[in-house]
């Protein structure tokens, strides 16, 4: 739900108030003690640029924000196992996968400043279990993953759609869904607050088989995390105007 729609439905006078409330909720969508993915299943890792083309600037990416994504690839029949956020006796509401034998498992998304090795390696270390099988597109930023204790499988893709569909299908499905969600629901977002929207997308994605437990999960997490303040958001907005940093997108 966009802040504008939220404002209208609740009858909130100021848009800024609705915006702040939603971001406080998004702050409660990331468990501070969440575990790393890839304990049982391979993990696809790739990056994408989020944001639209700036008018008159062709395909230039300096007005886009770089996001790294990591997603488990798991057998479809395993997708409906127990969820740590479910109360005892609850069952998932629906299945997914559209007939595929493998589907996307747990997801992580993170805004990053660049594609350098010193940026990407810490992202993998923080989110993916050691000894996990990690699949990438051959980008040099991941060259040392084997030395860090991962089973690294790199396949140079270089824009080949057939190779992408075969080697990294799930993360690119995720990226497509993310773009559609940001544009369709929020009509584009500011780079200053993009991570909050990514957190919401990941929260919804990881609970898509249990949509009715989202509220319960947010309440559990909310008592563990610090809520952002108005000052936090104004500081983020000021930083986004720095010409050396991403500017609003969408």
How does the language model describe each region?
Residues 1-250:
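Residue-level recognition of single "structural anchor" positions
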């Amino acid at each position: 739900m966009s802040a504008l729609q939220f404002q209208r439905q609740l009858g909130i006078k100021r848009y800024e108030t609705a915006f702040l409330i939603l971001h406080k909720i998004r702050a409660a969508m990331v468990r501070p003690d969440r575990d790393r993915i890839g304990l049982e299943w391979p993990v696809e890792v790739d990056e994408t640029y989020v944001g639209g083309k700036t008018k008159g600037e062709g395909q230039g990416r300096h007005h886009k924000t770089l996001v790294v994504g990591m997603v488990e690839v798991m057998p479809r029949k395993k997708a409906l196992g127990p969820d740590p956020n479910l109360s005892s006796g609850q069952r998932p509401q629906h299945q997914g996968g559209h007939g595929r034998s493998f589907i996307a498992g747990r997801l992580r998304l993170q805004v990053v400043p660049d594609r350098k090795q010193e940026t990407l390696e810490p992202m993998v270390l923080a989110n993916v279990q050691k000894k996990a099988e990690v699949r990438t597109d051959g980008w040099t930023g991941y060259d040392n993953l084997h030395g860090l204790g991962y089973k690294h499988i790199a396949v140079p893709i270089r824009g080949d759609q057939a190779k992408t569909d075969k080697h990294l299908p799930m993360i690119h499905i995720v990226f497509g869904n993310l773009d559609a969600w940001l544009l369709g629901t929020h009509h584009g977002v500011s780079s200053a607050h993009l991570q909050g929207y990514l957190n919401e997308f990941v929260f919804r994605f990881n609970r898509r088989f249990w949509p009715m437990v989202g509220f319960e999960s947010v309440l559990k997490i909310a008592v563990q995390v610090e809520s952002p303040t108005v000052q936090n958001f104004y500081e983020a907005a000021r930083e986004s105007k720095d010409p050396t940093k991403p500017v609003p997108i969408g």
